[in-house]
A protein has these predicted regions:
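Signature of the SF2 helicase/ATPase Hel1-core->accessory helical subdomain module
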Residues: 66, 72, 89-92, 96-100, ...
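Walker A/P-loop NTP-binding motif
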Residues: 38-42, 63-77, 97-101
Length: 598
């Protein structure tokens, strides 16, 4: 029920926002959004679920609308408010600007925290182990997962830099807080993951950036997350976020949510990954046997190689379109299914043997004293292998499964890629094409409230497509389309007269660079958005030395640092150019003289 006390808090927050926020503009569409969110979440529509879909065009002030309306209701009902964004840019916009402003004008006292997946945080144990000089105890692991090949000097320097910065508290342990993040392959070796994490059994538990962040999130009233984290956490049993029924969810940029959900119900693994994984798991088993003085279990490397060879003999003859072969909706062909089941049987046996050895190792550690560095490194290797073998078994299980007529079919396909040694790698993929029932049972039927909002939720003016993808029923929920505050009819849309087609990569890139050199004002603020990362890098190389002002390229710095540098340049009256991918613009607030040209 929308009580008089809650109404008063909402009105008080709105009036305070008018005073506290510079350049505040009263928009009727924002007022309607606040009212409808409040009514929906408070049960003012008894025949509807507490679910509202709001299409709110750019400029309405969506974030303020859902903060003003959701906060008092969440607090009054002792629920957590989960704000889930589609990308890091919007997440940081809310964290560093919108939520800070809300603390000033909100009539409700609240604490907030940022929640990210484990992989965004460093594992300090792994970082220290990799940074330390190689000792006799570490030679045992030379051929294991910690290093696929000897590290370069740059990698060693980067590890030392991260260790020093973390030890001196100059770095929080989040990859997004690094001014210059390490390459992905290096970060993977030091990032947290649930398979290698020993939680409270780790000597660095009290200093762990991930568990510090999780503790802060557990104490917060508002948790800022992203779509991927919410989906992963709910699917895996709420390890980071509160129980679904204790939460009110706001999915911002919700037009991305259906695609994100599909991705979380898809699996893939390549033939080369399978070969590498079986070898690495056997290496781990051999290391366990050597330390525990037990007989090593049977190797399955030869059987896996032979089974994969037989599978490749069949799939190499398929007719691929742009290196992709798509099976029909009845599932994979019988010959591929039989070969896949044979491979699955081998991996099931190998995985079972591996888990037995894992148990033996854990029992051995309980009964014997093992050097900490040996235990840490081997636990890390075991965790990685556990994850790899588990994912392969899941993939083969789903890939070879018979299609049932009473359930939505799955999509199965193979993608070819060429390795540096010119060898062909085959990626097996399987994905559900309809996850609406899963979303309904996991989230919509349990949540205390759900708000979907974006500038683009409808297709041809209808919410039907969104309802179909997310498993929502129009008669059971609330829907709202708001008018734009901008007069788009007065705006011209101009397409540059670029002669080269985008398919002519070299010519198009050269012409694009020439046009940008002509168009970029060295004294102004410019944002250039690309659909291709590789083209963005090439154009940056071509224009960097001639534009005579700061060029900030996405990927070279964190988004937060790029914006800080950009604002600093503009404050000093200097020109600044940002090169980013298309998603960079979502959630980035560049007002006034901070953006002159897109």
């Amino acid at each position: 029920m929308l009580t008089s006390a809650i109404k008063k808090q909402i009105r008080s927050s709105f009036e305070a926002a008018k005073i506290q926020l510079p350049n505040f503009s009263n928009r009727s569409s924002q007022n309607i959004m606040i009212a409808e969110i409040s009514k929906t979440l408070s049960g003012e529509y008894p025949k509807s679920n507490p679910i509202l879909c709001v299409e709110a065009p750019t400029g309405i002030g969506k974030t303020m609308a859902y903060l003003i309306s959701c906060l008092p209701i969440a607090k009054a009902n002792k629920k957590k408010l989960i704000i889930a964004c589609a990308n890091v840019a919007l997440q940081e916009q809310i964290l560093y600007k919108d939520i800070v402003e809300a603390k000033k004008y909100s009539s409700v006292e609240f604490e907030y925290a940022l929640a990210k997946g484990r992989s965004r945080y460093v594992c300090i144990r792994n970082l220290i182990n990799l940074t330390e000089e190689t000792s006799n105890t570490q030679t045992l692991f030379e051929d294991a997962l910690l290093w696929d090949e000897p590290p370069s000097q740059n990698q060693i320097n980067k590890l030392s830099e991260m260790t020093d910065n973390y030890s001196s508290t100059r770095w929080s342990g989040e990859i997004d807080d690094l001014e210059s993040p390490p390459e992905f392959s290096l970060w993977q070796k030091v990032a947290c993951n649930r398979f290698t994490c020993t939680a409270k059994n780790c000597e660095f538990y009290n200093d762990c950036s991930f568990f510090k962040a999780r503790k802060k999130a557990s104490q917060a009233d508002v948790i800022i997350a992203n779509h991927d984290l919410v989906l992963a956490d709910i699917i895996n049993g709420n390890n980071i976020l509160p129980d679904v029924n204790d939460c009110i969810f706001v999915f911002d940029e919700a037009h991305h949510f259906a695609q994100k959900a599909l991705a979380h119900f898809s699996i893939n693994a390549s033939t080369e990954f399978m070969k590498t994984s079986i070898r690495q798991s056997q290496s781990a088993i051999d290391q366990i046997s050597k330390i525990t003085n037990q007989k090593t279990s049977e190797s399955h490397i030869k059987k896996v190689d032979e089974a994969i060879g037989e599978l490749i003999e069949v799939i190499t003859n398929f007719e691929y379109l742009d290196d992709v072969y798509l099976f029909d909706m009845s599932g994979v062909s019988s010959d591929v299914a039989n070969l896949g089941k044979n491979l699955l049987s081998i991996f099931n046996t190998a995985f079972g043997n591996f888990l037995d050895q894992k148990d033996n190792w854990q029992d051995y550690c309980k009964r014997n004293t093992v050097k900490q560095i040996i235990m840490d490194n081997l636990n890390n290797i075991i965790g990685q292998n556990d994850q790899n073998l588990s994912s392969i078994v899941s993939l083969l299980n789903a890939f070879t499964q018979n299609t049932h007529t009473d359930t939505p079919p799955t999509s199965n396909w193979i993608v070819k890629s060429k390795l540096p040694n010119k060898k062909i790698n085959y990626h097996l993929n399987t994905a559900k094409i309809d996850v609406s029932n899963h979303l309904q049972s996991l989230i919509w039927s349990k949540a205390a409230g759900v708000i979907f909002t974006s500038a683009t939720l409808t297709s041809l003016g209808s919410f039907d497509r969104m309802n179909q993808q997310l498993g929502l029923k129009e008669k059971e929920n609330r829907y709202l389309r708001l008018a734009s505050p901008f007069n788009y009819k007065s705006v011209d849309f101009i397409v540059a007269n670029i002669k080269a087609s985008p398919s002519e990569v070299f010519e198009h890139t050269q012409e694009l660079a020439r046009e940008l050199k002509k168009r970029i004002n060295k004294e102004a603020a410019t944002l250039v958005l690309f659909a291709s990362n590789s083209q963005m890098q090439m154009v940056a190389d071509l224009v960097e030395k001639t534009i005579e002002c700061e060029l900030l390229v996405q990927g070279e710095y964190s988004k937060k640092r790029i914006l800080e540098k950009h604002f600093e340049k503009r404050k000093n009256g200097e020109g600044s150019v940002i090169f980013g991918l298309d998603s960079f613009a979502e959630g980035v607030d560049l007002k006034g003289d901070n953006l002159n040209h897109v």
